[in-house]
Amino acid sequence: MKKYIFLLIILAATIFTSFTDCKKDEVNNIENEHEIPIDIEKPDVVIKPIQMWIDAHANLSRFSQKSSITSYLKKMKETGFNEVYVDVKPGIGYALYDSDILPPLTKWGDETVERDWDYLAYWIEEAERLDMKVIASLSVLGYGYTKTKEGLVYEDDRWNGKTQKEMPDSSRPDLVVDMRDQTNVDAVMLNPAIPEVQIFILSIIEEIATKYPQLKGICLDYCRWYGGRYGFGNATISAFEAYSGVTVNNNNQIITRIGGIGPLYKHWIEFRSMTITNFITNIRSKVKAINPDLELHLWASADWRSRYIVGQNWASKKYKPTGSSSIYTDSYNKTGFADQIDVFSLGAYTDKIWIKEDPNSVWTVENFVTTYSDFTRGDCDVHGSFASYAYGNDQEKISDAVYLCLKNTDGLMVFDISHVINHNQWDAIGDGINRVYKK
């Protein structure tokens, strides 16, 4: 009997011990579930597009050799850039790519550069090797250089009557001056209200998009009227009459003899903006038909309230301006083109960085990069851009401008590499980038 009792005690002890061990394992497993792992996998930081602009005129000789392109692309990469805008059809109207439509750009003023290689193709090739992207930029409507009378519009009678014309003195409304005869403008610009002009430019964009499928995008620059008094030739007035249904008997119906706002002014403003927007829409259709993944970019001044003068309503169609009923029609919002571009390069080109420097003005980098969404309403990506020449050797300002643009928008563009080189701004740009990514 005692033997059986002893065996029962041993069995009970074994069961209890096993039960206790199971409970300990269960507790340990629960505790292990809540242990903090030693190696935490951090989420990937999304690096925004950080772009350098390569102006054709300022860098014509600098990039006459392949070795220079390679060297500076490496410098850009080391600084933090991952994309580059390459100006391939500047305002003189010649090509820096392999074109069957435009003459090659070999001479500009006193500079002469001969190449037996494809300029744009080499930028793309070297950028790809460094895991960088290229966007081809072009002066959309610029086709002549007034200071030396060089360019397409000076060589071909085809463009007679198709350039923009200025009414310089509203007290003499019948006097209009062809841009080709002026010397104080950046470029002679073709008239976007003329169908032949649009067809010609579309063919150039089609050529670039077709020949260079490796491009990330195409950027439109100078896609506008040159200024508020440009566009008063017969061709534009006729197009305005057809658009608005009004008859213009005198240009002073648009701008008065003393330079004020005439009774047709706001209708004129809508027409000019709609002309540009329809043109951009046509460009988008052409680009996307060739390559749906090819991005359409556009650069314009960040000061939206002054852009009506040149027909650039870069806002969303959802944005309706308030006030200024003498400037904007009730339907002006339909001229917004933010939904027709993929990327808007927001030109915050001003010497003031912080709002506190000039609190009563919109003209600060900080203001522009923190208020743009009021206008674009999310219709496109926006990259803050600044003019590096405005800050010279002031390293702090350069770093601040980079920081504000990159921190507050979808990307950054620095204009332009010639000023970055001349003022040795590389370290300051790198510092601004690192402030955003806290390296």
Name each region found by the language model.
Residues 14-45:
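Bacterial Sec-dependent N-terminal signal peptides
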Residues 42-63, 136, 141-210, 258-265:
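Active-site-adjacent "subsite" loops/lids of carbohydrate-active enzymes
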Residues 54-63, 101-116, 184-202, 262-277, ...:
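The substrate-binding groove and active-site-proximal loops of carbohydrate-active enzymes
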Residues 67-94, 213-216, 334-346, 408-412:
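Catalytic domains of carbohydrate-active enzymes, especially glycoside hydrolases
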Residues 79-115:
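Aromatic-lined carbohydrate-binding/catalytic grooves of carbohydrate-active enzymes
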Residues 96-108, 142-182, 220-257, 309-320:
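Aromatic- and acidic-residue-enriched segments that line the glycan-binding/catalytic groove
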Residues 143-146, 219, 228-229, 290, ...:
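Substrate-binding cleft/loops of secretory-pathway carbohydrate-active enzymes
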Residues 327-439:
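Substrate-binding cleft of secreted/luminal carbohydrate-active enzymes
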